């Protein structure tokens, strides 16, 4: 048996109202800064998963979902573009609901025997501006942890790609004309 459950990007300190990210793209090693009872419950769930895995050997896969969107939600994205502050709260992240389903399936099939957490986000941001530009404007003191592509997510999905085979298939760019 194995457990796959929904954790949350909020474990990382989102929304970024009181502090800034330690670095970007944020990954699973980023310090945890739960800023709400919801986020704290997710952090505690992740710790319980580690302990239950240690006690029982049952694998636990926690999926730290970004802001889950459906295709009909993409029409609102252009309303965010005039002011990057509107969506800075989660580093302009999102994930398509169909990619959430993919991540759940991959978690169930993964050859993992430990307790692991994975950030699950789209490969891009919700913005029509380069990610590096957004970061420099809104979080000028946050260092880049690695090189990033023009519109690459600032919520790193590298671990999910590597360990789960996660490969986001959907982007708002397929639905909204630029």
Can you describe what each PLM-predicted range is?
Residues 1-35:
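Conserved Rossmann-fold NAD(P)-dependent oxidoreductase catalytic core, especially the SDR/UDP-sugar
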Residues 7, 46-71:
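Conserved beta-loop-beta element that borders a ligand/cofactor-binding pocket
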Residues 16-24, 74-82, 133-136:
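Short, flexible, mixed-charge acidic loops at enzyme active sites
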Residues 23, 38, 92:
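Catalytic tyrosine of NAD(P)H-dependent dehydrogenase/reductases that use a Tyr as the general acid/base
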Residues 37, 41-44:
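Active-site helix of classical SDR
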Residues 98-178:
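C-terminal substrate-binding subdomain of Rossmann-fold SDR/epimerase-dehydratase oxidoreductases
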């Amino acid at each position: 048996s194995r457990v796959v459950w929904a954790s949350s990007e909020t474990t990382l300190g989102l929304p970024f109202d009181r502090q800034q990210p330690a670095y970007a793209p944020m990954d699973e090693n980023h310090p945890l800064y739960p800023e709400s009872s919801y986020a704290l419950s997710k952090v505690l769930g992740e710790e319980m998963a580690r302990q239950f895995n240690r006690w029982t050997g049952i694998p636990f896969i926690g999926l730290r979902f970004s802001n889950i969107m459906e295709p009909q939600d993409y029409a609102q994205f252009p309303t965010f573009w005039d002011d990057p502050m509107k969506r800075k709260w989660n580093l302009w992240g999102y994930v398509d609901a169909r990619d959430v389903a993919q991540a759940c399936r991959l978690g169930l099939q993964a050859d993992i025997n430990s307790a692991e957490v994975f950030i699950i986000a789209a490969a891009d941001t919700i913005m029509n501006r380069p990610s590096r530009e957004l970061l420099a404007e809104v979080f000028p003191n946050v260092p880049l942890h690695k090189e990033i592509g023009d519109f690459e997510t600032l919520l790193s999905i590298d671990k999910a790609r590597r360990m789960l085979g996660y490969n986001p298939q959907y982007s708002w760019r397929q639905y909204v004309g630029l």
